Amino acid sequence: MLLGTTSAQVVRPGSCPNVDVPIPPLGLCRTTCQTDANCQEGRKCCKNGCGFMTCETARF
């Protein structure tokens, strides 16, 4: 068991796309990230409209 370990919280600039309107790329119904740190540069960990989190291109 590892004690005292933490995951660094990374918050990338920009915002997530709006999921109120169905958008096909957001329809991936599985979790692919937990925080922005799990995503490539320029992408954020966002709600995908299915109740899960996926990496999406940040909106500015």
Swiss-Prot record:
One of its GO terms (molecular function) is peptidase inhibitor activity. InterPro entries: Elafin-like_sf, WAP_dom. Disulfide bonds join C16-C46, C29-C50, C33-C45, C39-C55. This is Waprin-Lio1. Residues 9-59 form the WAP domain. It comes from Erythrolamprus poecilogyrus (Water snake). Gene3D superfamilies: Elafin-like. Belongs to the venom waprin family. It comes from the Eukaryota. Residues 1-8 form the signal peptide. One of its GO terms (cellular component) is extracellular region. Damages membranes of susceptible bacteria. Has no hemolytic activity. Not toxic to mice. Does not inhibit the proteinases elastase and cathepsin G.
